Swiss-Prot record:
PANTHER family xref list: TRANSCRIPTION ELONGATION FACTOR GREA
Protein biosynthesis is among the record's keywords: no
Family the entry assigns: Belongs to the GreA/GreB family.
Name of the protein this chain belongs to: Transcription elongation factor GreA
Any single Pfam family the record assigns to this protein: GreA_GreB
NCBIfam families: greA
GO molecular function, one term: RNA polymerase binding
Origin: domain of life: Bacteria
InterPro entries named in the record: GreA/GreB_C_sf (IPR036953), TF_GreA/GreB_CS (IPR018151), Tscrpt_elong_fac_GreA (IPR006359), Tscrpt_elong_fac_GreA/B (IPR028624), Tscrpt_elong_fac_GreA/B_C (IPR001437), Tscrpt_elong_fac_GreA/B_fam (IPR023459), Tscrpt_elong_fac_GreA/B_N (IPR022691), Tscrpt_elong_fac_GreA/B_N_sf (IPR036805)
Swiss-Prot/TrEMBL keywords: Coiled coil, DNA-binding, Transcription, Transcription regulation
Role noted for this protein: Necessary for efficient RNA polymerase transcription elongation past template-encoded arresting sites. The arresting sites in DNA have the property of trapping a certain fraction of elongating RNA polymerases that pass through, resulting in locked ternary complexes. Cleavage of the nascent transcript by cleavage factors such as GreA or GreB allows the resumption of elongation from the new 3'terminus. GreA releases sequences of 2 to 3 nucleotides.
Biological processes annotated in GO: DNA-templated transcription elongation; regulation of DNA-templated transcription elongation
């Protein structure tokens, strides 16, 4: 599913991240440069809180650009037609029996960019997601997160609508 240091993503999320990068480069960094210029006009840089804040923001924005560029470079767009029925992978919906809590749970396995645990979307890189990968319906798995042991049984696997 993931080759080398690749990052599996949906086409929609890759486009969103490219737009976010463009916004940083075309809007936010130029705005920050203007803020630095205005702060410089205030004089003494040793006691210039506006200048210091603008420079800190510049560092933060540049770090965001670097991180996004690296992640976009690593991104591999997921092809939904590659989902294998009956095997957990990126792009599947998994119904589980949580034997630790006794509850039934349902998750969609996507990437870290799409992850929204509060909506039942988990990353294939998360502790649960990575332990589920390549497993089949009916399999049980047990793993530890921190000091808590988790025990699950896979009830069903289906293709997610992406």
């Amino acid at each position: 599913m993931v080759s080398g240091r690749g990052l599996v993503v949906t086409a929609k999320m890759l486009n969103a991240k490219k737009k976010e990068l463009q916004d940083l480069l075309d809007v936010r960094i130029p705005e920050n440069s203007r803020e630095i210029g205005r702060a410089l006009e205030l004089g003494d840089l040793r006691e210039n809180a506006e200048y210091k804040a603008a420079r800190e923001e510049q560092t933060r924005l540049n770090n965001m650009v670097t991180r996004l560029q690296e992640e976009i470079e690593r991104a591999q767009v997921f092809d939904p037609t590659t989902v294998v029925a009956g095997r957990v992978s990126f792009g599947t919906v998994i119904s589980l029996k949580n034997h630790t809590s006794g509850e039934d749970e349902t998750y969609t396995i996507l990437g870290p960019w799409e992850s929204a645990p509060e909506r039942g979307i988990i990353s294939y890189m998360s502790p649960l997601g990575s332990n589920l990968l390549n497993r089949k319906t009916g399999e049980q798995l047990a793993f530890t997160v921190g000091e808590h042991e988790k025990v699950y049984e896979i009830l069903s696997i289906s293709a997610a609508e992406i």
